Amino acid sequence: MGQSTPLLVIGAGLAGSEAAWQIASAGIPVKLIEMRPCKRSPAHHSNDFAELVCSNSFGALSSDRASGLLQEELRILKSFVIKTADEHSVPAGGALAVDRNKFSSYITKKISSHPLITVQRDEIHSLPFENQISVLATGPLTSEHLAGDLKNFTGLEECHFFDAASPIIEGESIDFSLAFRASRYDKGDADYVNCPLNKDQYLKFRSELLSADQAEIKDFEKGVSNLFEGCLPIEELARRGEDTMRYGPLKPVGLWDNRWGDLHDKELRKTKRAYAVVQLRQEDKNGHLWNLVGFQTNLKWGEQKRIIRLIPGLQKAEFVRLGVMHRNTFIESPKLLNPTLQFRKRLNLLAAGQITGTEGYAAAVAGGWLAGTNAALIAMNRKPITLPETTMIGALLNFISEVSPKVKSNHKRDFQPMPPNFGLLPELNRRIRDKRCRYGAYRDRALEDIKKTQEFLEIGTPLGFKNQ
């Protein structure tokens, strides 16, 4: 390849791990720099790569859902991280959830043992030299020093929002005389644990949330007031209205305990149906650990234990991890990046992952795949690629890197993190009224176009994909 100086990837999260793997798979040496354990972030719990600090779910599996389509596109593109997620999945109804510890441990071992990847455990205080091909994948928890240098480089204030993580409890501490196993509307296996609340229990729970003590905001987080709407703390939902939680993560619809009687008895349903339901999702293969779905929180740890133990079935809950809230950083990508994920003012510097303003694990992996692929192409003096806007990955990365025709000029003035969604895709050439059928048509078009991209990349194996 003629590339003697290793490429740099800064940050070994989901995006950085994927980027480093794609570069190495192209036969190009790469140095992956990770600041842990030299410096800890407020949210990480281990030194492993690709640690999942919030949920253990990559989102819906079905390819007629936005997150599922993005995952399927990544499988076609031979994503290392998504392949690992598939291999370490745990039951989660229609979602791709993983055993987070085994998932991250496997990625760490595979990357650390790759002959073309050198791992450096160190904090980077400034951006690489201008002649160094680099991928910036430091994530939403970018260190203060590097964030400051990035601000100087871009000439823009970085953007912030608060994100939060949910508690995890031991499965053995769940009281199944009150809780029950089921998936909503009985779709698939009974993969969730459900804790039903009646109206009095729900109102008591909400009242305690509203009066609970909050954890103190750290000095470096002061002045950041905005919360990310896709990951709101449960206490914030409680503040927004009496019914907000039970129309959100605590919604009871489609959940029935067979011990209550015949589901098809309408009169029985009226009297027995839960007023609200707290759901828990499996964390590990053996079902020893469970996370509370939608229970991101910034309550003090003692308050978390006290209030969660008010939930029927969790009165003796034993906690493995408690919820935390932390600041997330992202750049104003529409002003800074090309759809190739190259910085416009320095084309050999690329960005990937949540720091670019994509939201969700699978989207971070997608950014890592494209940034790593393009870094390898640049090293080979080849033209970087973009992905078709008809694909979920292409549409999402185009959205964050330029003003979309669907989003007028205010997009640049108020840029906020964006998850994958069908609203980003260009219209079909025919009108389809039924939403599920319409999403299916989007899926078919996207998968056809992403396969063409993969076939193009495999011509002459310029990136070595066939050897993965």
UniProtKB/Swiss-Prot annotation:
It comes from the Bacteria. It catalyses: uridine(54) in tRNA + (6R)-5,10-methylene-5,6,7,8-tetrahydrofolate + NADH + H(+) = 5-methyluridine(54) in tRNA + (6S)-5,6,7,8-tetrahydrofolate + NAD(+); uridine(54) in tRNA + (6R)-5,10-methylene-5,6,7,8-tetrahydrofolate + NADPH + H(+) = 5-methyluridine(54) in tRNA + (6S)-5,6,7,8-tetrahydrofolate + NADP(+). GO terms for cellular component: cytosol. One of its GO terms (molecular function) is tRNA (uracil(54)-C5)-methyltransferase activity, 5,10-methylenetetrahydrofolate-dependent. Its EC number is 2.1.1.74. FAD binds at residues 11-16. Gene3D superfamilies: FAD/NAD(P)-binding domain. SUPFAM superfamilies: FAD/NAD(P)-binding domain. Its cofactor is FAD. Catalyzes the folate-dependent formation of 5-methyl-uridine at position 54 (M-5-U54) in all tRNAs. Belongs to the MnmG family. TrmFO subfamily. HAMAP family: TrmFO (MF_01037). NCBIfam families: gid_trmFO, PRK05335.1. This is Methylenetetrahydrofolate--tRNA-(uracil-5-)-methyltransferase TrmFO. It comes from Prochlorococcus marinus (strain SARG / CCMP1375 / SS120). The lineage of its organism: Bacteria, Bacillati, Cyanobacteriota, Cyanophyceae, Synechococcales. The gene is trmFO.
